């Protein structure tokens, strides 16, 4: 597939760990954090509109982001594969610690755990699309890729928030057809800098250590609240937040990072990745 070798070399420099996705579905990764928006306010606030414009600006020069620029000491926690049975506890922990996060939603999970998305919205967290059924997109025809993205996006919008502008490909797998679908839906692909590999359940301490050791200015950290037993990730979350702040990092959402400290225009532009 066109550009696979060049892309893999480029992504090795920006995506650590090579993982990224629940083990069940994929083969594949401040002194004070910014406080999330007031409950229920994000979708209509001036801040939301500024962040949406920032996403549009970034889309003007790249279809993906795997980190912000290194200028600011900011990191973004991203949480995938939910909502799930522990999502409410993730939300409560983040709110208690005034820690922003970006949740990437699997559409079919809303059948059983829609209350989790409602809590994320009320807390003012950023919301992205993670496909309808956590499909490996490179195994789908182009039209089915677009449908997998759109079906989840429409479900998310039905909860009273705007159509999502951010998308994370399950397992990090994408190809030229994925990028074409994202252009159609005006979405930015969000990869990651630090893969905690929490889906392998290595223990809360190991998850925390990977998140903190891998953090650099502009890092996007990959965690999961769904797709399996996420008790270890939940247990690690407070220590991750405290230790990142002790190292002088400010926690932000992905849209906030794109507004404050967007990636360089010289970052590699992916053509395809995966099978």
PLM regions with names:
Residues 46-158, 259:
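Active-site beta->alpha N-cap acidic-glycine motif
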Residues 111-112, 135-250, 254-271:
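Catalytic domains of cell-wall/extracellular-matrix polysaccharide-remodeling enzymes
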Residues 1-76, 88, 92-102, 213, ...:
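Terminal accessory/targeting
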